[in-house]
Regions:
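Outer-membrane beta-barrel "beta-signal"
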Residues: 70, 169-171, 195-207
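Flexible, glycine/proline-enriched loop segments at strand-loop-helix junctions
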Residues: 10-16
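Outer-membrane beta-barrel architecture
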Residues: 26-28, 65-67, 123, 166, ...
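Detector for outer-membrane/organellar transmembrane beta-barrel domains
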Residues: 30-153, 157
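Conserved active-site loop/cleft motifs that coordinate metal ions or position small ligands
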Residues: 134-137, 166-182
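Residues that define the transmembrane beta-barrel architecture of outer-membrane proteins
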Residues: 19-23, 58-64, 114-118, 158-163, ...
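Short, small-residue-biased leader/transition segments that mark boundaries at the very start
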Residues: 1-6
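A glycine-biased, small/acidic residue-tolerant capping/turn segment at secondary-structure junctions
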Residues: 147-149, 178-179, 189-195
Length: 207
């Protein structure tokens, strides 16, 4: 799969047309209709041009993923996912908005690097009855520093956390209503932290 590389460049660096697609593989084990464990991996080669060295280079990224969902009781279900890798920002929710698949290397002029990053979430869903359920989820996305990054912008994003609680009611086969509360935190490399709250409501009619 050819995927657009999200990057942070400068006047000395630019992203080329990619020479190779991203290669992904996965395997899944199911032990009933609503429970499974899935493992996945991805490798990607990202090509860029250096005006300093007047040549093209490639940086290799990789990612590992594990996810699961399973019943604890007849009404209670657990779910979660864990991702770790380098240069996979475009595949991770919060990080996909930051253009950090590949970034300039402050310690090597005219070169770019892939940074370690992770993202995970875990949650529970409780089915009050066949038409009503409530759920809660916690998630974390984190970008790690290497080779002095981000020396020019310490206010850059380092970590984001979300806590979500919601409830949904399938009023009929056509009508669903729901409400959700979300609290989010952002921490920068400078350790500055901000937070926000959001309340969402949903009415959906299918026909």
């Amino acid at each position: 799969e050819f995927r657009r590389v999200l990057f942070r460049s400068n006047n000395d660096l630019s992203i080329n047309t990619q020479r190779m697609p991203d290669f992904a593989t996965s395997v899944q084990y199911n032990w009933n209709s609503s429970s499974h464990v899935k493992l996945g991996a991805i490798v990607r080669s990202m090509t860029y041009s250096s005006n300093v060295h007047e040549k093209a280079y490639s940086a290799t990224g990789f990612g590992l993923q594990a996810s699961t969902t399973f019943n604890i009781t007849k009404k209670l279900q657990a779910f979660g996912q864990f991702n770790y890798g380098k240069g996979i920002g475009s595949y991770l929710n919060d990080l996909s908005n930051l253009n950090v698949d590949i970034v300039p290397d402050p310690d090597n002029e005219g070169k770019m690097q892939v940074l370690p990053m992770l993202g995970w979430y875990a949650g529970l869903q409780y089915n009050l009855c066949p038409s009503i359920f409530i759920s809660g989820t916690y998630s974390l996305s984190r970008l790690y520093s290497e080779n002095g990054y981000p020396s020019e912008n310490p206010e850059s994003y380092r970590k984001g956390q979300y806590l979500v609680a919601n409830a949904f009611w399938n009023v009929s086969s056509n009508l669903q209503v729901g409400v959700e509360y979300l609290r989010g935190w952002r921490t920068d490399f400078s350790s500055a932290t901000r937070h926000a709250n959001r309340l969402n409501m949903l009415v959906q009619y299918s026909f």
